[in-house]
Structures are given as C-alpha cells and as structure tokens.
C-alpha cells in the first residue's frame, strides 16, 4: 500500500521481497498502525535507507522461507508464527525481516493482537521498566491516555503493580479509557494538570516515572511534582517542542 499525492492509501503491485542470507520471509497476517505510519503518510517520516517506501513498522505472520544464515544461527522454522519490527513495508502480503528482529507469537494471542507487540507494546515496556525503572507501588504519569502508546502503557504499568495517573482532553475521553485501569484520570478541559499532580504529591504520590509523548508545556507544568531521582522520558513532542 502506497500513498498518492493526496495522501490516500492506494493498492499497488510490487515484487515479492528477496531475502538476504540473514533474513526470513514472512507472510503477513496483520499489521499495526503507529504514529510513525501517520507521519510517513504526510511525508514527515521517511523510511530508513534501504527499507521499502510503503508503510508498516510492525507485523505478525507466518515464516515462509529462511535464508541460510538465518537458518544456521536461529531456531526459526517454516510455519512458525511470529511478529516482527520493520524499517517499513509492513502493509504488504510478504516482508523480509532479519532473523533477530522476530519474536514468537505468544500462546493465546490472535495475529491481530500480536501485531502490536514489536513496536507499541515494546516501546511502553522499554520506557517504563528499562529506562524508567518503574517498580510496584510507585507512581507513573502517562499523559495522553487515549493515545495508542498510553492505551498499552497504562494497563501494563497496572499489571506490574504501579499506580497510574493519566490525562485526557475531555470527559467523554475520560469515560472511554476508564477500563484501562488508571487510578487518576485528569480531564484537562476541567482540571489543571499541574494542580492535580500537586494534590497527588501532597497525598503521598509523587511521580516516579513519566512517559511523555506530548512534550510542549507538559514538562514545565509537571516536572516539579516528580520524586527525587525520578525519570521523565520524552518519547515524542506531539504538542510541540516548547
């Protein structure tokens, strides 16, 4: 799938990828939709050099072929169900992927569910628990609660025993994400984010880890309510740089 001059997705016939020795050919069953895909559609996020020029960063599917190096250095086999992180090209019937960029589809997950593991879920896990060192009993602030990343990061943090504060733009959005399990949902149309974070800090819940995909004024408003030694992780600047 490619984009025309009007930024619409169009079907296009392309040749099947030819795998390199260290690559695996995967027949695609499902693909994730990420912010990067939307930006690429607008011409603001070019694919890495050497990657297909059509969209798609994460997929799930079934291995159809292995290069000789991939076969020798891995335990992957034809027919294995996998999900993969790509430089691009996931919106296609087949993709070529390095063997070490694959993960097995966990038992119990559908292909559609597995397609969000390599980029969306992995980003949330990496930033909360590896970069941010979030632990059970600590507080995570995850603004933009209805975003793709936050909708995964919130239940992920809760599953590991953390307390979660998030923010949204309206009461309707707050209701729509209530099932994610956040302890505090800030409706920024009615409440000031900094005021709520200050109240939480005074109640004994300073922010240990913030996973921020907004940027803009969010950092200045909220940084004073971080605990000493806390982690503020900026993933994106959707609300601007300053």
Which ranges hold each PLM region?
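Glycine-rich phosphate-binding loop and adjacent beta-alpha segment
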Residues: 177, 217-242
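Glycine-rich beta-strand-centered segment in the early N-terminal region that forms part
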Residues: 15-32, 44-89
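NAD(P)H dinucleotide-binding glycine-rich loop of Rossmann-like/cofactor-binding domains
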Residues: 39, 70-72, 81-144
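Adenosine-nucleotide cofactor-binding segment
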Residues: 142, 158-221
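Short, well-ordered loop/turn sites that connect or cap secondary structure elements
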Residues: 75-76, 134, 226
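Short glycine-centered segments of the SAM/dcSAM-binding site in methyltransferase folds
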Residues: 81, 139, 163, 230-231
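Surface-exposed amphipathic alpha-helices with a cationic face
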Residues: 150-159
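Glycine-rich NAD(P) Rossmann-fold beta1-alpha1 loop
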Residues: 121-122, 144-151, 212-216
């Amino acid at each position: 799938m490619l984009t025309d001059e009007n930024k619409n997705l169009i079907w296009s016939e392309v040749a099947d990828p030819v795998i390199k020795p260290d690559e695996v050919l995967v027949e695609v069953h499902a693909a994730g939709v990420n912010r990067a895909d939307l930006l690429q559609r607008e011409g603001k996020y070019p694919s890495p050099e050497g990657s297909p020029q059509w969209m798609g960063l994460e997929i799930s599917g079934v291995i159809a072929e292995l290069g000789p190096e991939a076969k020798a250095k891995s335990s992957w086999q034809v027919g294995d169900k996998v999900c993969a992180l790509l430089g691009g090209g996931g919106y296609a019937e087949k993709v070529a992927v390095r063997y070490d960029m694959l993960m097995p589809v966990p038992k119990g997950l559908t292909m559609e569910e597995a397609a969000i593991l390599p980029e969306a879920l992995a980003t949330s896990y990496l930033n909360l628990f590896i970069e941010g060192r979030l632990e059970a009993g600590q507080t995570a602030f995850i603004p933009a609660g209805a975003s793709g990343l936050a909708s995964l990061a919130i239940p992920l943090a809760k599953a590991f025993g953390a307390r979660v504060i998030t923010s949204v733009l309206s009461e309707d959005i707050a209701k729509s994400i209530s099932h994610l399990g956040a302890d505090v949902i800030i409706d920024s149309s009615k409440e000031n984010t900094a005021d709520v974070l200050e109240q939480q800090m005074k109640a004994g819940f300073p922010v240990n880890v913030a996973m921020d995909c907004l940027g803009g004024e969010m950092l200045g408003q909220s940084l004073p309510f971080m605990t000493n030694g806390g982690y503020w992780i900026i993933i994106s600047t959707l609300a601007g740089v300053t």
